[in-house]
Amino acid sequence: MNKRLRHSKMKIAICGKMCSGKSTLANTLKIIDDRYTIYSLGQAVKDIGTNLFGMKEKDRDLLIQIGTKMREIDPDVWTKYLMEKTKYETHCIIDDMRYQNEYDILKENGFVFIQLHVSRHIQEQRLKKLYPKDFQRHLEKREHLSEKNEYVWSEGKEPVITIDNAESANIVIHRLHSFLQKNENDQMSIPLI
């Protein structure tokens, strides 16, 4: 009798433009399966903004400058930092993949990818609701490199799910349930040696 895997594992990275629903999706995945821990590549940037620059509210200009300056020193600084934090995790979600080099490193570390698409109209509505006082500053950053949501996907390492903001929440949740269950079933069918 073959022993079977007792515990599945999956590391997920979510990509999409600002206000496409990345954090909402990560939180939904965690509700569906509470084994997941959510990480953000941008959290260390936000921590620097808050702790060293006194940022009280999200200052996208400052965050972009911090992220860019640190990437000038090492383009992979943020991804390496998170790879170290997540190396022993079996169930984790990175909710903010934005750059090709991040994809390349995450791919090599066994992550699967979910890509979100948001229309400009919906994005603008969400930005206005989320940042009513300074939404215009966020709108001006829509063309920044971090907002392209375009990748050169390696064969076999394309997104496992692509979600358009036009899909209803119920359909998205059903798709996520199905995907997680399929992964669980696939891993349970692999015999241990």
Give the ranges of each region predicted by the language model.
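ATP-dependent NMP and nucleoside kinases share a basic, alpha-helical "lid"
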Residues: 32, 37, 83-131
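Conserved lysine of the Walker
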Residues: 22
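Hydrophobic positions on the alpha1 helix immediately C-terminal to the Walker A/P-loop
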Residues: 25
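P-loop (Walker A) phosphate-binding loop of NTP-binding proteins
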Residues: 17
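ATP-dependent small-molecule kinase phosphotransfer cores
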Residues: 37-92, 98-104
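Small-molecule kinase domains that catalyze NTP-dependent phosphoryl transfer to phosphate-bearing small molecules
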Residues: 77, 82, 107, 116-193
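Active-site signature of alpha/beta-hydrolase-fold catalytic machinery across serine-
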Residues: 28
